Amino acid sequence: MSKRAFNFCAGPAALPDAVLQRAQAELLDWRGKGLSVMEMSHRSDDYVAIASKAEQDLRDLLDIPSDYKVLFLQGGASQQFAEIPLNLLPEDGVADYIDTGIWSKKAIEEARRYGTVNVAASAKEYDYFAIPGQNEWTLTKDAAYVHYASNETIGGLEFDWIPETGDVPLVTDMSSDILSRPLDVSRFGLIYAGAQKNIGPSGLVVVIVREDLLGRARSVCPTMLNYKIAADNGSMYNTPATYSWYLSGLVFEWLKEQGGVTAMEQRNRAKKDLLYKTIDASDFYTNPIQPSARSWMNVPFRLADERLDKPFLEGAEARGLLNLKGHRSVGGMRASIYNALGLDAVEALVAYMAEFEKEHG
C-alpha cells in the first residue's frame, strides 16, 4: 500500500486512518453478520444499535444535556439555512443574524425567503478580517433567535467566545469546528454541523436542538424538514444516510479513544500555533485575520507573489501535501487542519513552506 497523503481539504476532509481501516475491515462482513452496514435495513436491531451508540458517544463527547435532542439528518448544513427559519421563525417574527463571511451570508439570504432578518452585526466593516465585538451588535429585543457561524471555513474567522443572548435562543453553524475543543452546549438553543469536516463523510448533518424549540414549525414546513417529526422518529422518518451515520459513529469512538475533546483542544492548539507562528515569522507568507479571530481549523495564507501559487501547489502535491488551494472566492492557500490531521501533517507543511520560501523568497 502506498503512503497516505496529508489531506488539507476543507471538506470532504481527512478521516482518521484508524476509522478507515476499521470500516475497510467491516465492509463486506459486519461483525460476522455476512453483510455490509450499507446493506442493512435501517429498522434492523443491528443498525438501530449502531445509530444509538453513535448518538450516545456524541452526547458523551460534548456532554449534551438530557433536554436536547440529537438529530442525524440529510441535506447538509446548507439545507439548515432554510430549515431553521421554517422551524423557529414565526411569520410575524424577526431573526437576528451575524455576518462574518460567506457561509453566514448564505444563511442570511436563505432566511430572508421566509421572514424578516435583522443583520445585527457584520464583519464587512473590518473587511471580514475581524469579528465585531458584541458591544457593536444591534440585537432585536424579542428576536425568534440569534444565528451566527462559529467558524467561517472560507475566510478563516472563528469566534473564540460564545455570544450572550439572554432568553433569545442562540443558533450556530458549527460545521467546521464542532468537536475541536470543549463546548458548553447548554448556552445554545440549536447547533448544527455538516458532517464532512470534523464528524465523518458527507451526506449527513447533525442537529443538536433544545426540546422546548420543537413543535414550532410553520404549517408550510415540509414534513421532511420538521425537527419535531425527525425527533419523534429517531431521525428515521425516512431512510437515513446509514453509512455516513455509521462512519460518524466510528469517528466518535476514535475521538473518545484519543481522550475526547479536551485532548483534541491540546492537539489542535499545537497545530494552529505552529502554522500561524510560521506564517507570522515570514515576510513571504501572510494571513490578514486579526489574531483573536483566527480560525483553529481553517488557515488561509497568501504568498508574496501570486504567480508562485501554481508552483507552490505543484511542489506540495509532489510531497503528499494535498488540497492546499484556497477557495475560489478568496484565492491564495488554505490549510484545513481538522481533528483527523495530526501535528505531523502541519510539521510537514511548515517544513515545505520554509523550503519553498528559501528557494523563491
From Swiss-Prot:
One cellular component term from this protein's GO annotations in UniProt: cytoplasm
Compartmental location: Cytoplasm
SUPFAM superfamilies, per database record: PLP-dependent transferases (SSF53383)
Keywords of this entry: Amino-acid biosynthesis, Aminotransferase, Cytoplasm, Pyridoxal phosphate, Pyridoxine biosynthesis, Serine biosynthesis, Transferase
Binding residue positions for L-glutamate: R43
Subunit annotation: Homodimer.
Family under the similarity heading: Belongs to the class-V pyridoxal-phosphate-dependent aminotransferase family. SerC subfamily.
Name of this protein: Phosphoserine aminotransferase
Native species: Pseudomonas aeruginosa (strain LESB58)
